[in-house]
């Protein structure tokens, strides 16, 4: 192979890599009918669909409307409760990596049918991916004098609030009272939830998240 051909090949590979997008999504709970019966503090259903069949169909359609076959998708846990429900991932575009959640209790071999890798957490350029939100004391980046952004799932339609992260308050009490009275608590900018209830039931790109967040702006 000539030097010119080699350079062209490297440029082509670089362009292909740049054209691929990284997406994130969490807490799909495919096939989990009980999820569609849960209600919030105000008695409103957490998910606006009748059952898992309807919800799964919507999530599949929306997933493939934004994710291409060569895109990367980090799934931040609680994918499905059964092997049968997990098989919907065959129809979901993208090369998938699982950040394991507390309800992902099937065998590793089951998950490896659909995922390229399984991890407990993962770091990107400025972001830590986890299922459960990481303790705020672990988000400070001393060398860079800034915070990690924790992209997480687990909380469904709720978010990590500044009240919950403040050690001088009773944990969660202020945020809970605000929610009971229909007030959205002030979000902690060090956290971003990719639970389907928070992102329109479809994966969101990492660039989209970065455009919406500023983990430096913290108390």
Per-segment meaning from a language model:
Residues 2-76, 80-219:
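Extended recognition/assembly regions associated with phosphoester-bond processing machinery
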């Amino acid at each position: 192979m000539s030097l010119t051909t080699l350079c062209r090949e490297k440029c082509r590979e670089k362009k292909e890599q740049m054209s691929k997008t990284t997406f994130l999504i969490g807490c799909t709970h495919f096939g989990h009918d009980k999820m569609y019966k849960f209600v919030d503090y105000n008695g409103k259903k957490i998910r606006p669909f009748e059952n898992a069949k309807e919800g799964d169909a919507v999530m599949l359609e929306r997933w493939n409307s934004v994710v291409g076959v060569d895109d990367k998708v980090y799934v931040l846990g609680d994918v499905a409760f059964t092997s049968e429900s997990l098989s919907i991932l065959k129809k979901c575009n993208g090369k998938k990596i699982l950040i394991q959640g507390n309800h992902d209790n099937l065998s590793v071999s089951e998950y490896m049918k659909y995922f390229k890798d399984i991890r407990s957490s993962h770091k990107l350029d400025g972001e830590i991916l986890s299922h459960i939100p990481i303790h705020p004391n672990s988000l400070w980046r001393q060398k860079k004098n800034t915070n990690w952004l924790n992209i997480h799932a687990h909380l469904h339609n709720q978010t990590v609030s500044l009240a919950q992260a403040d050690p001088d308050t009773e944990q969660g009490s202020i945020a809970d009272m605000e929610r009971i009275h229909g007030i959205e608590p002030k979000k902690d900018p060090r956290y971003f939830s990719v639970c389907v209830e928070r992102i329109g039931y479809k994966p969101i790109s990492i660039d989209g998240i970065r455009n919406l967040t500023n983990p430096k702006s913290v108390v």
